[in-house]
C-alpha cells in the first residue's frame, strides 16, 4: 500500500513536470510579432475615381512566421486633406494570431477639385409664401459626387415671409477630404405685385476664374411678355478679387417690370 502511494505521488510529480515543460515550450513559441508592411513609395498619386486596388499599389506585407500576407492588407484610414494638398493613407494587416501591423504614406489626387454649388432657381421668394432657404440649391464634389444633403447654412437674421427685404445667408458644404466650400450671398423676399414680367436666365449661379472677363449679358434668356421690354443689368462684379457677386436683370415695358438675379463666384 505504501509503495502504491509513493508511486502515485511520483506519477503526479511527473505529470506536473511534463505540464510545466509544455507550458514553457508553448510560451516560447507564442507569436507576439506584428506583420511588417512595406510601401514601395512614400507618395502615391491617384485619381479621385480610383478604388482600393489602386490605393494598395506597391504595398506588401510579410510575417516572420506566416510569410507573405500582402493579400490581407487593407486601407484602414485616409486622413483629411493637409495644407500641402495631400492626405495620409494608413494600411493595416493582421496575422492568424491577431497581431496587427500598420504603415502610412502620403496620397495625392491628380484630378481633385473642391465642392461647388449649383442653383436651379433664383434665391427670390414671394411675400406670404413659406419657403426653404436651400430650395433649388445643390452641391457636388469631384471626390464624393452629390453633396446636397451635406449643405448647411447660417442667416444673419430671422427671415419673415411677411416682410419684404434682402437677407444675408452663408451656405457651406464639406467633402470627405475635410475641405469646406462657402457661398455667401443674399436672398430676397419680394412683393409679387412689383414684378409682373417673368425674366428668364440660362443659369442662376456661375463660377468664373480670377482676372477673367465675364459677359453677364450672355446669361439673359429673354422675358415672358408680349410687349417689347428694355433690359437693364446692374452688377457689382469685380473679377480682380475673389468673392461672391451678383447681376440683377431688370426689364420693363414702361408700365410693368420684372427682375431676376444671377450669382457669380470669382475664384
Model-predicted segments: where are they?
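A short linear-motif detector with a strong N-terminal bias
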Residues: 15-18, 25, 39, 54-55, ...
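Serine/threonine-rich, repeat-prone extracellular segments and beta-strand-based repeat modules
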Residues: 2-12, 65-105, 109, 144-189, ...
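Gram-positive cell-envelope targeting signals
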Residues: 1-39, 50-51
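Solvent-exposed, low-complexity, repeat-rich "mucin-like" stalks and linkers
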Residues: 28-66, 113-146, 194-227
Amino acid at each position: 500500500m505504501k509503495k502504491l502511494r509513493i508511486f502515485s505521488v511520483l506519477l503526479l510529480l511527473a505529470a506536473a513536470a511534463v505540464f510545466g515543460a509544455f507550458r514553457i515550450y508553448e510560451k516560447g513559441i507564442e507569436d507576439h510579432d506584428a506583420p511588417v508592411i512595406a510601401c514601395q513609395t512614400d507618395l502615391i498619386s491617384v485619381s479621385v475615381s480610383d478604388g482600393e486596388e489602386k490605393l494598395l499599389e506597391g504595398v506588401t506585407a510579410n510575417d516572420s512566421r506566416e510569410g507573405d500576407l500582402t493579400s490581407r492588407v487593407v486601407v484602414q484610414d485616409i486622413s483629411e486633406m493637409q495644407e500641402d494638398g495631400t492626405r495620409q493613407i494608413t494600411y493595416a494587416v493582421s496575422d492568424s494570431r491577431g497581431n496587427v501591423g500598420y504603415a502610412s504614406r502620403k496620397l495625392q489626387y491628380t484630378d481633385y477639385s473642391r465642392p461647388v454649388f449649383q442653383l436651379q432657381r433664383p434665391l427670390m421668394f414671394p411675400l406670404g409664401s413659406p419657403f426653404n432657404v436651400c430650395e433649388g440649391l445643390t452641391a457636388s464634389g469631384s471626390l464624393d459626387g452629390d453633396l446636397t444633403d451635406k449643405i448647411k447654412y447660417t442667416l444673419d437674421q430671422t427671415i419673415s415671409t411677411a416682410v419684404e427685404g434682402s437677407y444675408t445667408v452663408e451656405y457651406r458644404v464639406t467633402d470627405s477630404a475635410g475641405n469646406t466650400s462657402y457661398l455667401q450671398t443674399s436672398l430676397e423676399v419680394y412683393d409679387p405685385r412689383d414684378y409682373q414680367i417673368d425674366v428668364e436666365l440660362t443659369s442662376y449661379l456661375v463660377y468664373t476664374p480670377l482676372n477673367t472677363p465675364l459677359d453677364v449679358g450672355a446669361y439673359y434668356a429673354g422675358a415672358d411678355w408680349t410687349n417689347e421690354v428694355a433690359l437693364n443689368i446692374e452688377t457689382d462684379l469685380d473679377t480682380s478679387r475673389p468673392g461672391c457677386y451678383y447681376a440683377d436683370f431688370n426689364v420693363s415695358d414702361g408700365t410693368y417690370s420684372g427682375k431676376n438675379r444671377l450669382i457669380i463666384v470669382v475664384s
